[in-house]
């Protein structure tokens, strides 16, 4: 992951971690929609902490898998 170059789009430079962030945000919103529709989200004691930990876990996994 550290060998990826900086991406330049329309004159703006983005670090490689920015694209991992976008992918993890997309997966996060998909997971939240699935959890809401399946009813599992009703069993969550503290939704804000659950959302934060879910996003952190997704971001960590994607960063270390090298997506």
UniProtKB/Swiss-Prot annotation:
Sorted UniProt keywords: Cell membrane, Membrane, Transmembrane, Transmembrane helix
Membrane topology (UniProt): Multi-pass membrane protein
A Gene Ontology term for the protein's cellular component: plasma membrane
Top-level taxon in the UniProt lineage: Bacteria
Disulfide bond entries: none
Residues that span the membrane, as ranges: 10-30, 43-63
InterPro entries: DUF1656
Subcellular localization: Cell membrane
Any Pfam family the entry gives: DUF1656
Protein family per UniProt: Belongs to the AaeX family.
Stated name of the protein: Protein AaeX
Organism: Musicola paradisiaca (strain Ech703)
């Amino acid at each position: 992951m550290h060998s990826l170059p900086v991406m330049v789009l329309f004159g703006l430079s983005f670090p490689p971690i920015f694209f991992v962030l976008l992918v993890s945000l997309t997966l996060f919103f998909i997971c939240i929609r699935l959890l809401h529709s399946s009813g599992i989200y009703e069993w969550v004691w503290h939704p804000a902490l659950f959302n934060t930990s879910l996003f952190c876990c997704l971001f960590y996994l994607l960063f270390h898998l090298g997506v």
